[in-house]
From Swiss-Prot:
Family designation: Belongs to the NRAMP family.
Name of the encoding gene: mntH
Domain of life: Bacteria
Residue spans crossing the bilayer: 44-64, 77-97, 121-141, 152-172, 181-201, 218-238, 273-293, 310-330, 366-386, 387-407, 419-439
Organism name: Bradyrhizobium diazoefficiens (strain JCM 10833 / BCRC 13528 / IAM 13628 / NBRC 14792 / USDA 110)
Disulfide bridge positions per record: none
The name this protein goes by in its record: Divalent metal cation transporter MntH
Functional description taken from the UniProt entry: H(+)-stimulated, divalent metal cation uptake system.
GO cellular component labels: plasma membrane
UniProt keywords, alphabetically: Cell inner membrane, Cell membrane, Ion transport, Membrane, Symport, Transmembrane, Transmembrane helix, Transport
Chief subcellular location: membrane
C-alpha cells in the first residue's frame, strides 16, 4: 500500500514527487483571520467552528436509531458505550486536525501523495461509497422529519431533500464563518430540544450517572453487545476525518513551527468541546428513550417514527414529539452541509477533480435518493428503517480505510517532524483503530448473517 515502487519516487518526507501540492479547499484556505494579540479566549474563539462542523456527523439519523434502540431496550446501561465511542472520536479527530495543520494536506491529499494511483482510486471509491451512505441517512432523516412535522409523504420529502443542494452554495457565498455560524445555530436548536425533553422525562440522576460506568453484561449479553457495536459503528464517521483535516486549514495561522503548535492546541480544544456537545445529544437521546420507553415497558422502540408517536403521550408534554422532529430536521440540514464539504474534499484530494459545490451535491444526493424512493414505494416506512441500518453498515466497511492511513501518517516522523505523535499516543491510537475495525467487522458479519 506504499508508494515505494520503482516507478514512484518520494522526497525526504516520504511524499510522492510527481504529485503537486495544492491547497485543500483553496477558496476558503487561510480565509479566517486570527487576532495577532490579546487575551487567550479571543484566539480560541477564532478557532471555534471546525470542531462543530465535525460534530454534526456524530448525531446523524444513524446515531438516533442506535441510541433509541439502546435506551428503550436496556435503559441507561449503554451510556458507557456512548462515552467510550466519544472518547475514541475525540482522539481520532485531534489526529486529523494535527495532520492537516502540520502537513498543509488533508487526509485525502496525504493519501494521494503517499500511495500508488491504483490504491488511491480504491480508497476514493470506498470513501465515496461512505459519503453516499451518509447522504442516504440524511435523506431518510430529513424525509421522516418533514413527514412528522408537515405530513409530507416520504417520497415527497426525499425529493424536497434534493433541493438543499443549493444550501451550501448560499452559505459559502457568505463566507466560511457564516457557514460555521449556521451549523452552530442548528446544533443549539438540537441541544435545546433535547434539554427540554430531558427535563420533562425527569430521569433519576443516580441511575443516569451509574449508566456511564462500564458493565460486564455488555459483553455477556449478545443482544446488548450487538447494539453497543452499532453505537460505536454509527458514532465514528470516516468522512469526518477527511473533513476535519481540511477545514482546520481555513484559519490563517502562521505556517511555521510556532504557529502550527498554537493551531494544534486551539483546534484540539475546539473539537473536544464540540464533541462533548455531541456526547450530550447522543446521551440525551438514549436517556429520553430509557426514561420514557424503557420505563413504561416499550422496550422495542428502534424507529424514529415510532418514537415520535409515543413521546408526547408518555411524557405528558404536547410539544415533546414536535421538538423531537424539529431536532431531526435540524440534524438533517446540518449533515447536508458537512457531507457536501467532505465530498468536495475527497474528490479534490484523491483525484484533483474540481466540481462546483452545487453540481457535486446534486450528483451525490441524486444517487442517494434513488434507493430511498424505490424502497419507500415498495416497502413503505419500515423499508426506510432497514435502509438506515444498511447505510450504517456501509459506513462501517469504509472506516478502516480512513483510520489506518491517518494513524500511520501522524506516527511518521518523516512526514510530521517534531509534531509526530509519541509512541504512547500512537499505541493508544492503534488500539482504538484496532477496536473500531474489529467491532465494525463483527457488526457487518452479524448484519449480513441476520
Amino acid at each position: 500500500m506504499d508508494a515505494r515502487s520503482p516507478d514512484l519516487t518520494t522526497d525526504a518526507a516520504g511524499w510522492r514527487t510527481d504529485v503537486p501540492t495544492t491547497k485543500s479547499l483553496a477558496e476558503v484556505n487561510a480565509s479566517v483571520a486570527l487576532p495577532t494579540a490579546g487575551v487567550w479566549w479571543r484566539r480560541l474563539l477564532a478557532f471555534v467552528g471546525p470542531g462543530y462542523l465535525v460534530s454534526v456527523g456524530y448525531m446523524d439519523p444513524g446515531n438516533w436509531a442506535t441510541d433509541l434502540a439502546g435506551g428503550s431496550k436496556f435503559g441507561y446501561t449503554l451510556l458507557s458505550v456512548i462515552l467510550l465511542s466519544n472518547l475514541m472520536a475525540i482522539l481520532l479527530q485531534s489526529l486529523a486536525a494535527r495532520l492537516g495543520i502540520v502537513t498543509d494536506r488533508d487526509l485525502a491529499q496525504a493519501c494521494r501523495a503517499t500511495y500508488s494511483p491504483a490504491v488511491n482510486f480504491l480508497l476514493w471509491l470506498a470513501c465515496e461509497a461512505a459519503i453516499i451512505a451518509c447522504d442516504l441517512a440524511e435523506v431518510i432523516g430529513t424525509a421522516i422529519a418533514l413527514k412528522l412535522l408537515f405530513g409530507i409523504p416520504l417520497i415527497g420529502g426525499a425529493l424536497i431533500a434534493a433541493l438543499d443542494a443549493f444550501l451550501l452554495l448560499l452559505l459559502m457565498n457568505r463566507g466560511f464563518r457564516f457557514l460555521e455560524a449556521f451549523v452552530i445555530a442548528l446544533l443549539a436548536v438540537i441541544a435545546v430540544c433535547f434539554a427540554v425533553q430531558i427535563v420533562a422525562a425527569a430521569p433519576p440522576v443516580a441511575e443516569v450517572l451509574h449508566g456511564f460506568m462500564p458493565k460486564s453484561e455488555i459483553f455477556t449479553n449478545p443482544e446488548m453487545l450487538y447494539i453497543a457495536i452499532g453505537i460505536i459503528g454509527a458514532t465514528v464517521m470516516p468522512h469526518n476525518l477527511y473533513l476535519h483535516s481540511s477545514i482546520v486549514q481555513t484559519r490563517a495561522y502562521e505556517r511555521n513551527e510556532t504557529g502550527r503548535r498554537e493551531a494544534i492546541k486551539w483546534a484540539t480544544t475546539d473539537s473536544t468541546i464540540a464533541l462533548m456537545l455531541a456526547l450530550f445529544i447522543n446521551a440525551a437521546i438514549l436517556v429520553v428513550a430509557a426514561a420514557t420507553f424503557h420505563k413504561s415497558g416499550h422496550s422495542d422502540v428502534a424507529e424514529i417514527g415510532q418514537a415520535f408517536e409515543l413521546l408526547s403521550p408518555l411524557l405528558g408534554l404536547g410539544i415533546a414529539s414536535t421538538l423531537f422532529a424539529i431536532a431531526l430536521l435540524a440534524s438533517g440540514l446540518n449533515s447536508t452541509v458537512t457531507a457536501t464539504l467532505a465530498g468536495q474534499i475527497v474528490m479534490e484530494g484523491f483525484l484533483d477533480l474540481r466540481l462546483p459545490s452545487w453540481a457535486r451535491r446534486l450528483l451525490t444526493r441524486g444517487i442517494a435518493i434513488i434507493p430511498v424512493i424505490i424502497v419507500t414505494a415498495i416497502y413503505g416506512e419500515r423499508g426506510t428503517a432497514d435502509l438506515l441500518v444498511f447505510s450504517q453498515v456501509v459506513l462501517s466497511m469504509q472506516l478502516p480505510f480512513a483510520v489506518i492511513p491517518l494513524v500511520r501518517f501522524v506516527s511518521d516522523r518523516r512526514k510530521m517532524g517534531k509534531f509526530a505523535i509519541s509512541p504512547y499516543v500512537a499505541a493508544i491510537a492503534w488500539i482504538v483503530a484496532g477496536v473500531i475495525v474489529v467491532l465494525n467487522l463483527k457488526l457487518l458479519a452479524d448484519t449480513l448473517l441476520g
